[in-house]
Amino acid sequence: MPSDVKVTSNLKGLEQLQKNLKTKLVAKLGIFASDNSRDDGGKTNAEIGARHEFGVLSEGLPRRSFLKDPIEIKRKELLETANKVIKANIAKEGGAEKIFELIGIAGEAIVQEAFESGGFGTWKELTDFTVNKKGGSSQILIDSSQLRKAVISKVEKGE
């Protein structure tokens, strides 16, 4: 007795998944050359950022990490976001690039939250001298917003 059953397969999703898994990309978060200059023409955002990220003890400038520490503090949330992004995009065309782009954007959001919250409460308060020098502002690292706007993410080919 002949059968009218026809078996077909669509491996496009599987093939795209395989392609995405082989893609070697990396999401980078920081201050890059294109966003490095400042309106006042003084130190670059990268120079100012490095001074605050690591501190300059010889000048009495405490460490106020806006990159490494906030990402570490919010690591669990970032990993949860990454997991959701991976599940939603891994089998899609262009999915690998989208995954890394969205993870980078999530990192940017964490950094911006750190600027708004004083490093999630970890940054040392400004001294009275510094507050007076700034005309009474006690806000940390956000007077001109140039440094925080310079922090971006980008996706590059990995090794």
Describe each PLM feature range.
Residues 1-159:
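Short, Lys/Arg-rich flexible segments
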